């Protein structure tokens, strides 16, 4: 909960710990490994039209200096649709998370009034059963599916978690 407290104290609009940080944590725990690997990025997402790209980078650098034990990756989801082919701007952080490439990566957590809040738009079956498959958003577009397939090859997740089941459709 310490990392979630740090994120909550940033007081960023619509902010979450998300994506690979949580996916990898779950897979590590279920595989009997240390939950948060030292080399893991901490994927922090937020949504605020009033925070520029440069301000986001400055915030990331500040966090890196204050908490050097972690590799912070802070992304304002206002700008991130441009990294996904044929994708309209996201409406909020949840919209962005729901359109990540893999269903098991579409996961986010935060503290809301000091209570854990989880967002799993596709449920937890894929992540707890070590299944990697594209989200509906990626399935509906050939260019996005090419990005998805390139990610599968690049990430080489089965080397770390050999029991993963990878689906490319």
PLM region spans:
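Catalytic cores of the polymerase beta-like nucleotidyltransferase superfamily
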Residues: 1-169
